[in-house]
Amino acid sequence: MSGTEEIRWVTLGYVMGAFGLKGEMRVRSLTERPDGIFDHPVWWLFNPKQKTRQEMRLGSGRLHGKGVVATLAGVTTREAVQALFGTEIQVPRSMLPDGGDDPGVDGIWADLIGCQVVEVDGTELGRVVEMMATGANDVLIVRGGPEGEKLLPYIEEVVVELDLDRQIIKVKLMEGM
């Protein structure tokens, strides 16, 4: 990567709070497999309020109930974790597997989160804030539109165009959506 190339950051999860007293943290993972967030030994914690990003090394991680619990090197107290509450866990897009030149409906989740979702007639539905695996197909969780939250199946019949460069997903809603 050249020095002039801008890094595209991908949010893999969020620090949700402390777990216990010894620096463990509850993490909301946005990866397809919740423990997939542990595939990345280095996390960049982005504070959206301060617009700062801090590189941290993953200490340990494990599944716990429906979520995940992690430790970071150098973060050893509950108070230190509390200071990280709400930060986004990010990695450079270049550190994720390549979805190919035309990912179609096989694009990886990280590429879809943050995309604007628009109906084929131009009606804005919101942005993809999360993905969900259902077994039959993946589901886009879309928020921020006039109709509130929408759950859209990530299938060819619904996703008619995917423009990752412009971060736009065009959809054709099925009856009842």
Curated annotation (Swiss-Prot):
One of its GO terms (cellular component) is ribosome. Residues 104-177 form the PRC barrel domain. The keyword rRNA processing applies. Its main location: cytoplasm. It is found in: Cytoplasm. Pfam families: PRC_RimM, RimM. Disulfide bonds: none annotated. Coiled coil: none annotated. Keywords: Chaperone, Cytoplasm, Ribosome biogenesis, rRNA processing. InterPro entries: PRC_barrel-like_sf (IPR011033), PRC_RimM (IPR056792), RimM (IPR011961), RimM_N (IPR002676), RimM_N_sf (IPR036976), Transl_B-barrel_sf (IPR009000). It comes from the Bacteria. The keyword NAD does not apply. One of its GO terms (biological process) is rRNA processing. SUPFAM superfamilies: PRC-barrel domain, Translation proteins. One of its GO terms (molecular function) is ribosome binding. An accessory protein needed during the final step in the assembly of 30S ribosomal subunit, possibly for assembly of the head region. Essential for efficient processing of 16S rRNA. May be needed both before and after RbfA during the maturation of 16S rRNA. It has affinity for free ribosomal 30S subunits but not for 70S ribosomes. Belongs to the RimM family. The PRC barrel domain binds ribosomal protein uS19. Binds ribosomal protein uS19. This is Ribosome maturation factor RimM. It comes from Magnetococcus marinus (strain ATCC BAA-1437 / JCM 17883 / MC-1).
